Design a protein with these regions (language model features):
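Short coil turns linking two alpha-helices in DNA-binding domains
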Residues: 1-2
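Key DNA-contacting residues within the recognition helix of helix-turn-helix
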Residues: 7-10
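Ligand-binding beta-strand-loop-alpha-helix segment within the catalytic cores
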Residues: 35, 40-80, 102-183, 190-192, ...
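Short Lys/Arg-enriched helix C-cap and helix-to-coil transition segments
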Residues: 17-32
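Gly/Ser/Thr-rich active-site loops/lids in small-molecule metabolic enzymes
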Residues: 188-218, 269
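ATP/nucleoside-binding phosphotransfer catalytic cores, i.e., glycine-rich phosphate-binding loops
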Residues: 31-32, 218, 222-297
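Gly/Ser/Thr-rich loops at beta-strand to alpha-helix junctions
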Residues: 82-92, 181-183, 251-253
Length: 297
């Protein structure tokens, strides 16, 4: 192969956003931590963003979004079927993606929408933006994630228009999800759809978080019941079967919910940061912490 041909190929790859040449310091401590987590929780992939003590929460979130965007860009291939959940973390991640890849991938919602229809984090906005950035296709969901009754939810799920979406759920290659934290975090764009009775029931059953708008306890057990039956979204057992299920989340307050997801292997790829992983290991009383040098926190 001629040198000029290689040069042209590299230039084209850079232009399409496939290749980015950067010189970065290799963090051996983070690498070792990733290997430990990957082995402990049987993960296909993990990306741990280093933390600097002076970083604000906003800066930490931005670093996470950039790392997640870079990972997703690498993983989406020609004709991939990609399921997308929604929320602030995923919205920020999608905003960070810069891609000129032409993939013809299909991007589909895996949960109903929030109550605030104009939200920039609405799942329909996210699948549209992903399809635009990867020169792919998308379909929308035209129902809020929580319905008033199980009968209403069943009617929507059984409808002709919803069949196409459910068919794609059965063929997902990749799922990209956020992970919600404790019940006390109520400023979410969909938790206002929950009733007082929903909150009371979830508190009694010790919910620690949610994913795809499905609540679970500290062991990762899905909390089934009236709320579950009113929820439009992929259930976590289904998420577990997706070849690449990517969870994107950070913060100590979410560590219990992330740990629960890992215990049940609902996700096989985690993108998070250093302080979150260390908090997870503290919750697990993992001896690995005894050997870890807290250089940057």
């Amino acid at each position: 192969i001629y040198r000029t041909t290689v040069s042209r190929m590299i230039k084209q790859a850079k232009d399409e956003g496939i290749v980015k040449i950067e010189i970065q310091e290799f963090n051996t401590q983070i690498y070792a931590l990733e290997r430990h987590m990957k082995s402990k929780y049987k993960l296909k992939d993990i990306e741990i963003v280093p933390v600097v003590e002076s970083d604000s929460n906003e800066k930490k979130n931005q670093k996470l979004s950039k790392a997640a965007a870079a990972y997703i860009k690498r993983k989406i291939e020609m004709d991939s079927i990609v399921g997308v959940s929604w929320g602030e973390t995923l919205g920020d991640t999608v905003a960070e993606i810069e891609s000129k890849k032409k993939t013809n991938a299909m991007f589909v919602p895996i949960a109903g929408g929030p109550s605030h229809i104009n939200s920039k984090y609405h799942v329909n906005t996210l699948v549209y933006e992903m399809a635009r950035k990867f020169s792919g296709q998308n379909i929308f969901v035209n129902a809020t994630v929580i319905q008033e009754t199980p009968q209403l939810k069943k009617g929507i799920m059984d409808s002709k228009y919803f069949k196409e979406l459910k068919d794609y759920w059965e063929r997902l290659d990749i799922a990209i999800v956020g992970i919600g934290g404790p019940l006390r975090i109520r400023e979410s764009q969909w938790r206002d759809l929950l009733t007082k009775e929903d909150y009371k029931d979830l508190e009694l059953r010790e919910a620690v978080g949610d994913c795809c708008c499905r609540f679970f306890d500290h062991e990762g057990k899905m909390l089934k019941g009236n709320l579950y039956e009113r929820t439009i979204g992929l259930d976590l057992y289904h998420l577990k079967k997706v070849p690449l299920s990517v969870g994107i989340a950070r913060s100590k307050v979410k560590s219990k919910s992330i740990l629960a997801m890992l215990k049940k292997s609902y996700i096989n790829c985690l993108i998070t940061d250093e302080e979150t992983v260390l908090e997870i290991l503290r919750l697990e009383k993992d001896p690995y912490l005894d050997t870890y040098q807290l250089k940057e926190i």
